[in-house]
Regions:
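Small-aliphatic-rich amphipathic alpha-helix that forms the alpha element of a beta-alpha
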Residues: 22, 41, 69, 102-104, ...
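Short, surface-exposed helix-loop/turn micro-motifs enriched in polar/charged residues
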Residues: 61, 139-140, 156
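Conserved acidic residues
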Residues: 101-102, 161
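Flexible, active-site-adjacent loop/turn segments at secondary-structure boundaries
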Residues: 17, 26, 31, 85-88, ...
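N-terminal amphipathic, basic helical "cap/leader" segment at the start of enzyme domains
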Residues: 1-100
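A glycine-rich helix N-cap at a beta->alpha junction
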Residues: 153-170
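Solvent-exposed coil/turn segments that connect beta secondary-structure elements
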Residues: 46, 74-76, 109-111, 143, ...
Length: 170
């Protein structure tokens, strides 16, 4: 196949359309996410898609599943519980690194060599979900990790790896 011309797909599948539409944005509408959109976003990020085995939408190295997804809003921060598909309150106050209706913080244990890779996989799920549903996001490494670690009540080697402000396009 060396030297053969490759053809661009016709974007007939939902996945191909999401890939075509994926872009980063840092400007968001002030419109809040609906509960359904927030629920779907969390599930797409790292939810359980095979209840019989507990396996997730995002693969992870050696199936460690150590990425924790925190949801930060203007009112407070919550930990996503994939087993129950619920948000558990962590703290009050606004700690969003970039002002969007919601900011997802991807946390892993730095004692694992795989945390950054696993965070990247979850990040891609978030980006593709947003592109496929017409929502806006940008994966970011820039954040005050020490302040987030304190606000999210992280322990030991847990640290924020990436954050995803999410909202609707402005």
């Amino acid at each position: 196949h060396i030297g053969k011309k490759l053809y661009i797909c016709a974007f007939k599948s939902l996945v191909m359309t999401a890939l075509k539409n994926r872009k980063s944005t840092r400007e968001f509408s002030t419109k809040e996410l609906s509960l359904k959109d927030l629920s779907d976003l969390c599930w797409a990020a790292n939810g359980i898609n095979r209840p019989e085995s507990g396996k997730r939408t995002a693969p992870s190295a050696m199936n460690k599943q150590d990425i924790k997804v925190y949801v930060c809003t203007a009112d407070g921060s919550y930990l996503y519980n994939p087993q129950k598909n619920t948000l558990e309150p962590v703290s009050s106050g606004d700690v969003r690194p970039l002002k969007a209706p919601v900011c997802l913080i991807l946390v892993s244990d730095t004692s694992s060599d795989w945390g950054a890779m696993d965070a990247g996989i979850v990040s891609q799920n978030i980006s593709l979900f947003c592109a496929g549903t017409g929502m806006a996001t940008v994966p970011r490494g820039s954040m005050d990790k020490a302040a987030l670690k304190k606000a999210l009540k992280l322990t030991g080697d847990q640290t924020p790896f990436l954050n995803h402000p999410v909202g609707y396009f402005k």
